[in-house]
Each structure stands twice: as C-alpha cells, then as structure tokens.
C-alpha cells in the first residue's frame, strides 16, 4: 500500500496547488493521499483567508483523501519548526510511504546534501551563523552566507538557497533524516509565480497575489479551480471571510499597548532585543503597518515579526515550543475525509503512534485511553498533548472573532463544526 503525504496551507487552494497534487500522484501512484494542513493561522504569521474546515473541504474535492491539521504551535513557526511538526505527524501515523514537496530548484542532491550537512555538523554551522548574524543580517540571509562558507559553494548556490520552497524542502529532508524515517521524499519543480509575488500574473499566480485580489474585491476566479472558487464565494457570502491581518489591526495594536517588556520574557521568538523593539514601536504606532515597519531590521523580517505577535497573543511559552520541537506532534486531528479516506483512517487508528482525534470534545477521554494502554507503543507526553491541543482551540476562538459577519463570530468552532465528509470531484 502506497500512501502519499503532502504538507500544505491551501490559503487558498489555487491552480498551482492542483498542479502540485496531480504531479505528486504521477510520481508516487498512491493508493491514498493525506494532507497535513495548517489550521486557522499560517506560517507567514497571518490568519487564513477562510477557516480550516472550508479549506479542508476544498482539498477533499480536489483529490485529497484525509486532511489532518498541523497544530498551531508548528503552523506559526519558522521553516524548521513548521517542517518538523509536519514530518513528525506524517511519520507517527506509520502508514505514509512517500512525501512530495514543491521546490524552485527541484535538485534533490542539492537539497539532501545541505540537509545532511546541517544535521551532521550543527555546532560548526551555528558558529558561522552567529558570525553572520552579528553583521546585522536577517536570519535567512545569515543562514544563506553561513551555508555558502560552510559548504564552500559558489554564487549559483546562493541563488538556490534564497528560494522559499528550497529552504522549506531542506528542513523537510532534515527532519526525515533526523527521525530516521522510512518515508521516501520526492521534489516537484515549482511553476508559475514566486511564493511572495503580490500581483496576479498568470494562470499559476501565488497565494499571496490571490489573497490580495480577494481583499481588494478584485476578480480571482481564473486563478483557482472552480471547486475552490465556489467554496470561497460561499464562505464570503455567509460572512465567514475573507479574514486578513488587516481585520485584526485594532485588536493587535490594543493587545500590544497593554504589554510591558517583562511580559515577553517567557515568550518564544523574543530574543536579540525583539521585545525592546516591540515596546518602543507600539508607543508611536497608529497602524499595524507602521508598527511592523518600525520593528523591522535586517535581522527581524516581517514574517518573523508577525509570527512573534501571534506567539505573544497565544502565549507560546519558550519551554513548551522547545519541548514541542523535541518530541514532535502529539496527536492527529482530523479535519475531513472522503469515503475512500475512511478506509485509510481505519488502518491508521490501528497503527498510529499518536492518538487520532475525530471528536475534540472527547480529547481528554482519548488521552486517558492512550496513557493507560500498555499494549501499544505510544509516543505521547500528557502535558504537551494538552498544551498543543489547547492552543488549537484558542486559535480558532480568536480567529472567528474576525469574521466580517458578526452573527458568525461564535465561540467554540472546533466543537461545533463536524468533520468534513467530502468526495473527490
């Protein structure tokens, strides 16, 4: 049995995503396809444009058999944390045979060489990284130049290591190697617009450009499959989107104005004076864009700053994130499945090293059952399971507060919304 895993955000699901999925299936010829998908907040440090259940529905309509949620504590981390959370989830399910990810270079040897080198020589690389960071470079640039020196590579190497998907790909492979996972990995050449392109250009435009068009109320139908377009328009018609960082502006600024520097001491990602820059900037910022601009330096990128805001908002304690990045994902929360996927879920439930959560209301009962089960080798830490799960619930409760339609801003989305049971179209 071949089971393909894809790691996605689908924010929103667009033509490039469909191409990636179709190509992945051609490479692997899987019996089933699993998606590990970010929940209501995404890796760039932004809310998803529509909620996780609607995005899971679109995924099922386009060829995914089962959608699991990537816990918020990983979805809102940098490439390393994001990748580790997703790969540990796939690995602990024990049924996934292959993973396919997009890459600008599609150079498997390059990606593997860099991943192995980073994994085998962490101290030497860390020292080079610190030297570059002291020059005032952003983390991505510091990593790029440190890797160039570390591997003694040429200028072409620098161009490759700048690519968003190549960087993420390196982290995926690094996690697979670190876990000694048996999962096979494959690369697909990324086509169309670049990850960060902000304007619609072709059939394969970036998710960023499509979100910008949606927020500006511009046409976007050409750039997404019809199945995606219909669900997006339905959610918008009910006032359950679009949700954007701009919607949250006053809430975020108010939250930050209530903070003191000491409040950030225990929060993950507040290092190297970021807390001081937050406190200084919020005193003179009337708009979120002003705040981001004032905090930004070569070292602190916009994405890192946005993620740090949500780390503070969701109270991401350093000790728990570090613990999460050591032990990995503690459960597999189902967002949706097809009839075909239901057969796979039966197999997963018998073999998984982490509990499968289908009904969030019963998560405590599920945990208790796992902790008292002596017949199976579970990889679950009680304290971490509870903490990771609670952060998902908090994230949903905050997310729904920013639906355009006030009547839709209900508490307890995770407990009210049933699992999506869809069919491929």
UniProtKB/Swiss-Prot annotation:
Keywords of this entry: ATP-binding, Cytoplasm, Ligase, Nucleotide-binding, RNA-binding, tRNA processing, tRNA-binding
EC number: 6.3.4.-
InterPro entries: Rossmann-like_a/b/a_fold, tRNA(Met)_cyd_acetate_ligase
Any Gene Ontology biological process: tRNA modification
Family classification: Belongs to the TmcAL family.
PANTHER family recorded: TRNA(MET) CYTIDINE ACETATE LIGASE
NCBIfam families: PRK13670.1
Protein name: tRNA(Met) cytidine acetate ligase
Taxonomic source organism: Thermosipho melanesiensis (strain DSM 12029 / CIP 104789 / BI429)
Gene this protein is translated from: tmcAL
């Amino acid at each position: 049995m071949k089971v393909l895993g894809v790691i996605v955000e689908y924010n929103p699901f667009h033509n490039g995503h469909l191409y990636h999925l179709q190509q992945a299936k051609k490479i692997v010829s899987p019996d089933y396809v699993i998606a590990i998908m970010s929940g209501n907040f995404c890796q760039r440090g932004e809310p998803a444009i529509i909620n996780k259940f609607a995005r899971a529905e679109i995924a099922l309509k386009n060829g995914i058999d089962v959608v699991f949620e990537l816990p918020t504590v990983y979805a809102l981390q940098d490439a390393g944390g994001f990748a580790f959370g997703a790969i540990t989830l796939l690995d602990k399910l024990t049924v996934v045979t292959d993973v396919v990810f997009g890459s600008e270079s599609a150079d498997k040897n390059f990606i593997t060489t860099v991943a192995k080198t980073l994994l085998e020589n962490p101290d030497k690389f860390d020292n080079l990284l610190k030297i570059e960071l002291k020059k005032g470079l952003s983390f991505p640039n510091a990593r790029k130049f440190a890797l160039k020196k570390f591997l003694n590579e040429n200028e072409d190497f620098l161009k490759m290591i700048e690519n968003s998907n190549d960087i993420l790909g390196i982290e995926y492979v690094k996690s697979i190697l670190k876990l000694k996972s048996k999962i096979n990995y494959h690369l697909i050449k990324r086509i169309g617009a670049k990850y960060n392109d902000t304007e619609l250009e072709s059939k394969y435009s970036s998710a960023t450009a499509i979100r910008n068009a949606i927020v500006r109320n511009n046409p976007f139908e050409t750039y997404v499959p019809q199945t995606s377009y219909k669900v997006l328009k339905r959610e918008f018609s009910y006032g359950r989107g679009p949700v954007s960082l701009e919607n949250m502006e006053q809430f975020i600024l108010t939250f930050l104005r209530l903070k003191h520097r000491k409040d950030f001491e225990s929060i993950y990602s507040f290092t190297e004076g970021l807390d001081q820059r937050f406190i200084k900037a919020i005193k003179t910022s009337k708009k979120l864009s002003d705040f981001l601009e004032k905090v930004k330096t070569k070292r602190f990128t916009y994405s890192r700053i946005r993620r740090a805001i949500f780390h503070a908002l969701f109270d991401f304690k350093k000790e728990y994130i570090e613990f999460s990045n050591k032990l990995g994902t503690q459960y597999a929360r189902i967002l949706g499945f097809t009839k075909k996927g239901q057969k796979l879920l039966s197999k997963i439930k018998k073999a998984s090293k982490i509990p499968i959560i289908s009904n969030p209301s019963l998560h405590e009962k599920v945990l208790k059952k796992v902790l008292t089960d002596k017949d199976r080798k579970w990889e679950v830490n009680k304290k971490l399971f509870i903490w990771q799960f609670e952060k998902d619930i908090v994230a949903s409760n905050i997310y729904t507060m920013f639906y355009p339609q006030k009547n839709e801003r209900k508490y307890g989305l995770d407990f009210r919304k049933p699992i999506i049971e869809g069919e491929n179209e």
